[in-house]
Swiss-Prot record:
It holds the Pfam family HTH_1. GO terms for molecular function: DNA binding; DNA-binding transcription factor activity. It comes from the Bacteria. Belongs to the LysR transcriptional regulatory family. Residues 4-60 form the HTH lysR-type domain. The keyword DNA-binding applies. InterPro entries: ArgP (IPR017685), ArgP_gammaproteobact (IPR023490), LTTR (IPR050176), LysR_subst-bd (IPR005119), Tscrpt_reg_HTH_LysR (IPR000847), WH-like_DNA-bd_sf (IPR036388), WH_DNA-bd_sf (IPR036390). This is HTH-type transcriptional regulator ArgP. It comes from Vibrio cholerae serotype O1 (strain ATCC 39541 / Classical Ogawa 395 / O395). SUPFAM superfamilies: Periplasmic binding protein-like II (SSF53850), Winged helix' DNA-binding domain (SSF46785). Residues 21-40 bind DNA. Homodimer. Controls the transcription of genes involved in arginine and lysine metabolism. Keywords: DNA-binding, Transcription, Transcription regulation. The gene is argP.
Amino acid sequence: MRGLDYRWIEALDSVVSKGSFERAAEQLFISQSAVSQRIKQLEKYLAQPVLIREQPPRPTLVGKKLLGLYRRVCLIEQELVPELTNQEHVRPVSMSIATNADSLATWLLPALDKVMKSRQVELNLVIYGESRTLDKLKNGEVVGAISLEPQPITGCSAEYLGQMEYLCVASPEFYQKYFAKGVTPRSLIKAPAVSYDQYDELHNKFLWDYFAVLRDKVINHTVGSSEAFVRLALSGAAYCLIPRLQIISELESGALINMTPDFMLSYPIFWHHWQLETGVLLEISDAITAYAKSVLPQ
């Protein structure tokens, strides 16, 4: 019986990553019909579909598992072949990491700095909410993810990194305008706030846990940028929850004030990654774990 042909999965990967059969054909230097034929052969071999044929095409659950397998094999190949053939000039190892915006804006880039400077590596940092990054790892789209989930998924490891601490802050002028009589449920309902996106549960949790206020009762801007949170707070346009690490100088200078010194939101984060014990991924895992533990409260 003929085994699984990785050219079939390569075609699937190209269609999904490029978003169409046409662009996949251009990437693989074959005809569009050849791409389609390879995917049909893969589906015939597995006796089930691997691709949802819509625009853009999406992998089925089985397709996602195959892509995860294929990308692991590609990563191992990228590191092993140059070593076996003594190649001096090789293409950089390419890998994707899923991270929340706040980790990227505070500690993640310094953690990766040494590896990025010393190794031939191309990193694709995919930004998602910390409650959803693990889905990218489950689907095989990334090699590692910063997540709230402590339990590793099958074939992966998880390391505790530390606590992300959030402060509720605003400019002095904003505070005087909306909270001169204190931070209360009534004043919070009147004051504009900021959330990252519709999946951002951080602000919802803060409002409900400490003040029993529901999100739909407040004025809430949506801005998909951690840096924009700081700028909005500094400008006096809104108050928001921001990582303590991101605003140390602003707090020290008085440009921002901690609105609720008695309340601080804190949650643990974890680094999930494929179980590869050598190579660049191991270096990245060691760098992320060591740096995070040096700057995040444990």
